[in-house]
UniProtKB/Swiss-Prot annotation:
It comes from Latilactobacillus sakei subsp. sakei (strain 23K). Pfam families: MMR_HSR1. Transmembrane segments: none annotated. The gene is engB. NCBIfam families: GTPase_YsxC, small_GTP. This is Probable GTP-binding protein EngB. Signal peptide: none annotated.
Length: 199
């Protein structure tokens, strides 16, 4: 999709605050500082529209970005950040679970995993959760520019094995620095949302 218009419409913590215009939605999940904001910025061709932060755990709400009046990206709170209190982590979990299990507009989940490492228990739990609720998933291995391309296939194999990856889902190696994988991510989004466009 060729993106010219993007608007951060709202931050929500409850269904009563979600958008009501019935556009398809793609959720983005991952550990704190895995690169969700960087992925969003790359997809919409902006350098810093979605705020990137050196402070993990900064996203504490569901942030809805309307793209070209055709769909929403929904940035959900990052998980796995130890310095966030247990009570706050539970609150984040409830917000995420309520959205993923009850939102009719949701068309798929982009699950971001740090491509340099094996998936964490939280990464695996999120993937299993999505599969239980039959949510289509695109697994995006981030920060791949920090790994030599000759090792990408090995890392993909390690991640897929840890997740017990379902072949019906899609996997892509991504770099916000080089843009590697960007077109593949957009192709999956367009397919899930039944929209089309040039990148």
């Amino acid at each position: 999709m060729e993106v010219h218009e993007v608007e951060m419409v709202m931050s929500a913590v409850a269904a009563s605050q979600y958008p009501t215009d019935q556009l398809p939605e793609i959720a983005l999940s991952g550990r704190s500082n895995v690169g969700k904001s960087s992925l969003i910025n790359k997809l919409i061709n902006r350098k810093s529209y979605a705020r990137t932060s050196s402070k993990p755990g900064k996203t504490q709400t569901l942030n809805f970005y309307r793209v070209e009046n055709e769909l929403y990206f929904v940035d959900v709170p990052g998980y796995g950040y130890a310095k966030v209190s247990k009570k706050q982590r539970e609150k984040f979990g409830q917000i995420i679970e309520a959205y993923l299990t009850n939102r009719d507009n949701l068309r798929g989940l982009i699950s971001l995993i740090d491509g340099r490492h094996e998936p964490t228990d939280d990464d695996i739990a999120m993937y299993v959760f999505a599969k239980y609720y039959d949510i289509p998933v695109l697994v995006v291995a981030t920060k791949m520019d920090k790994i030599s391309t000759g090792k990408w296939n090995r890392q993909e194999k390690i991640i897929k094995e840890a997740l017990d990856f379902n072949p019906v889902d899609k996997f892509v190696c991504f770099s916000a620095l080089t843009g590697a994988g960007k077109d593949t991510v957009w192709e999956w989004i367009e397919q899930q949302c039944d929209i089309g466009g040039r990148r």
